């Protein structure tokens, strides 16, 4: 029970997901190389201008990367923030920020993503084509597809 409380602290708050209102929330998580921390300043400045408050934020330092072609972790900083979907201008701001993130060599965590442009995914994940080739080999008829995979052109 103690481990569950530690690993899932929000579960101790009744209906924590309602804090963002009926429109719900999105979780935005990215990783950036050490030495590229100025991207945080740009993010926070823009979110402050939007008056977008996050109920939950987590900053972690990552170590080694996995060998998987679409692996998210790599050496650097990862930041996760939750935001209300009702924040005016948030979607446009994040679209613009995604471009800056790519320019800085960063990438979005695809598992938690619901909005990134499919054109940016190969730029964020240099081994994207390797993933597609593995996928074609393992599932040549394209039987196994998710909505997200179709949206991001992963299949």
Task: List the predicted regions and their residue ranges.
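Substrate-recognition/cap regions that form aromatic- and gly/pro-loop-enriched pockets
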Residues: 2-123
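Activity-critical C-terminal alpha-helical subdomain
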Residues: 102-155
